[in-house]
């Protein structure tokens, strides 16, 4: 779901009363991209521990005369062993002709997951939204929550009603561009191959995001019905515009780094002569660089507007019309900001927090990720680390209270779109490949 990440840090001390971390705050790589870095490091440590006695291993190898490379003799042995069992031959016959997931789907797992529930949210939208070829799942999930409240409050007859995902997407891209350039300014003294800066440069313009990122957008920009700012081709197919924007923003980043260096050099004489203090020099450099960044952001906005169309401004008035449940025409004039304040029912952008389960750390800790975000100086992305059991309890409580639930998971692993089933028992990888599906805490423990 998300954006960019590097080393984790605690939330900033400038957070509001509702945002301020407790003394239990820890730092952690919770975001999926940062988590990937942690796994790489853990695997490296694991390998290092196995290979620490390299010389001893070499001696043992010489004694046993075991070749370190793939030998042709080994190929003969492996080839004979590959299909030595009947199950291996059956798997090969089946899987080389069809999709692995289609072939290994377990019928009993599908049958045990019937879409009949003891509780459900009272208001449901008839139309299933479609993010198409984009990574905007987090925006769709959030607007799906809110649209149910709008349908209920405005008594909208059309159950296909949607809020504009592309409206939030436009401003997310605008903010992420600024967020990237501000990070570049802050890290301008580091080389491009610095691990943190290098990672940020490869992930800053992704479509993904987190709960706190979308609520930050909603608080600042509001929401609009999809009829006010509908989908464009590029909002539904983001690959090309993402590439173009990434190329342009990297060029802008280099401009800012060069400008900072030149400005510092120009003011160094005044600093050496004592005419200005170091603090004054640094402030002048920052003002100069940020002024240039503001000019760059004009180009960013222009490129986004060309690709997506110009969106309403947060306080720009629009008119929305609909039919109520009795078929009567209704209309109102409002702004995106006021729409999210007045017509979104019980939804409150900052009334919820993200619960996560990270088995590497103990429960009941507030965690964040360094440089993960979209709006500069907004509330940081925060998570409460807890147990799967508590997460499930809160989901049940929300549904019983009539509220749909925003959640994020790796849906590509054990889900089947046609039946809508998500189950770790859905695909029998173990019978075909000998791969066991283990809980994350077991996998993490195995890397220690």
Indicate where each model-derived feature is located.
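Structured alpha-helical subdomains that flank or immediately precede key functional sites
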Residues: 2-134, 139-448
């Amino acid at each position: 779901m998300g954006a960019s990440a590097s080393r984790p840090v605690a939330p900033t001390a400038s957070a509001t009363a509702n945002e301020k971390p407790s003394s239990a705050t820890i730092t952690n790589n919770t975001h999926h991209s940062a988590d990937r870095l942690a796994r790489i490091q853990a695997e490296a440590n694991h390998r290092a521990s196995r290979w620490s006695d390299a010389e001893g291993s070499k001696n043992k190898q010489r004694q046993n005369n075991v070749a370190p490379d793939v030998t042709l003799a080994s190929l003969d042995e492996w080839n004979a062993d590959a299909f030595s069992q009947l199950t291996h031959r059956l798997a090969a016959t089946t899987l080389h002709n069809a999709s692995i997931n289609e072939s290994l789907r377990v019928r009993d797992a599908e049958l045990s997951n019937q879409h009949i529930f003891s509780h459900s949210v009272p208001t449901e939208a008839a139309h299933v939204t479609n993010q198409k070829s984009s990574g905007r799942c987090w925006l769709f999930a959030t607007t799906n929550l809110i649209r149910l409240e709008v349908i209920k409050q405005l008594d909208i007859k059309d159950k296909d009603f949607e809020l504009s995902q592309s409206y939030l997407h436009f401003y997310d891209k605008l903010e992420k561009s600024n967020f990237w350039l501000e990070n570049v300014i802050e890290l301008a003294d580091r080389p491009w191959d610095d691990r943190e800066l290098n990672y940020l440069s490869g992930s800053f313009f992704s479509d993904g995001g987190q709960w706190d990122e979308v609520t930050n957008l909603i608080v600042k920009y509001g929401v609009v019905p999809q009829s006010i700012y509908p989908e464009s081709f590029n909002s539904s197919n983001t690959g090309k515009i993402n590439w173009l924007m990434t190329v342009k923003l990297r060029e802008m980043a280099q401009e800012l780094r060069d400008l900072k260096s030149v400005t510092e050099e120009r003011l160094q004489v005044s600093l050496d002569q004592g005419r200005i203090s170091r603090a004054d020099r640094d402030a002048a450099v920052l003002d100069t660089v940020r002024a240039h960044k503001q000019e760059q952001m004009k180009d960013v906005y222009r490129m986004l507007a060309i690709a997506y169309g110009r969106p309403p401004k947060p306080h720009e008035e629009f008119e929305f019309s609909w039919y109520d449940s009795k078929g009567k025409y209704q209309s109102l004039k409002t702004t995106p900001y006021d729409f999210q304040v007045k017509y979104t029912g019980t939804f409150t952008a900052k009334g919820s927090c993200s619960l996560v389960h990270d088995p590497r750390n103990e429960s009941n800790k507030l965690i964040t990720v360094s440089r993960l975000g979209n709006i500069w100086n907004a509330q940081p992305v925060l998570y409460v680390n807890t147990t799967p059991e508590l997460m499930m309890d809160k989901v049940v409580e929300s549904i019983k209270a009539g509220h749909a639930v925003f959640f994020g998971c790796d849906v590509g692993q054990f889900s089947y779109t046609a039946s809508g089933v998500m189950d770790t028992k859905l695909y029998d990888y173990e019978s075909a490949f000998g791969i066991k599906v283990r809980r994350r805490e077991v996998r993490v423990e195995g890397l220690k």
